[in-house]
Amino acid sequence: MNKVPLTEKGAQQLREELQELKTVVRPKVVTAIAEARAHGDLKENAEYHAAREEQGFVEGRIRDLEHQLAHAQIIDVSKLQKDGRVVFGVTVDLVNIETDEEASYQIVGDLEANIKENKISINSPIARALIGKREGDEIQVQAPSGIILYEIAAIGYQ
């Protein structure tokens, strides 16, 4: 199985979610099942069936998180060699050459990607175009509206 890149911060978030599911959510679901079971006939007990369904979702998510963490290659961004190149985990400030619009993205693994937080997947077209480039370099990104040209304004290793 291939290792999936994950920043230290992303791995910590997954660990926290896993801990929450195991120590808080799972016991609540077990209690809900026990309470619903106490109501009697299980065939027509909607509370029981809902609690069992929730238990299935929780257990599935726990398995997913454990699998993701077991197959993660955790990369501490602060320990990366700061040689001025764009690599996994860095934050890149870009300037659209045509519009002078600025954007900032952190390159993260697929599990952490969230455009609302300006985190883009290492497998995204823009990240693939950025990897290995240096500050001041220009890149071309194929977008639905056509090719967009960006200049790398800054690279941050935080």
Curated annotation (Swiss-Prot):
Keyword Coiled coil: yes
One annotated GO biological process: regulation of DNA-templated transcription elongation
PROSITE patterns assigned to the protein according to its UniProt record, in alphabetical order: GREAB_1 (PS00829), GREAB_2 (PS00830)
Keyword S-adenosyl-L-methionine applies: no
Recorded superkingdom: Bacteria
Function, in words: Necessary for efficient RNA polymerase transcription elongation past template-encoded arresting sites. The arresting sites in DNA have the property of trapping a certain fraction of elongating RNA polymerases that pass through, resulting in locked ternary complexes. Cleavage of the nascent transcript by cleavage factors such as GreA or GreB allows the resumption of elongation from the new 3'terminus. GreA releases sequences of 2 to 3 nucleotides.
Protein name: Transcription elongation factor GreA
HAMAP family (alphabetical): GreA_GreB
Transmembrane parts of this sequence: none
Entries under InterPro entries matching the protein: GreA/GreB_C_sf, TF_GreA/GreB_CS, Tscrpt_elong_fac_GreA, Tscrpt_elong_fac_GreA/B, Tscrpt_elong_fac_GreA/B_C, Tscrpt_elong_fac_GreA/B_fam, Tscrpt_elong_fac_GreA/B_N, Tscrpt_elong_fac_GreA/B_N_sf
GO molecular function list: DNA binding; RNA polymerase binding
Species, as recorded: Nitrosococcus oceani (strain ATCC 19707 / BCRC 17464 / JCM 30415 / NCIMB 11848 / C-107)
Residues forming coiled coils: 1-26
Swiss-Prot/TrEMBL keywords: Coiled coil, DNA-binding, Transcription, Transcription regulation
Family as reported in the entry's similarity comment: Belongs to the GreA/GreB family.
Any matching Pfam family: GreA_GreB_N
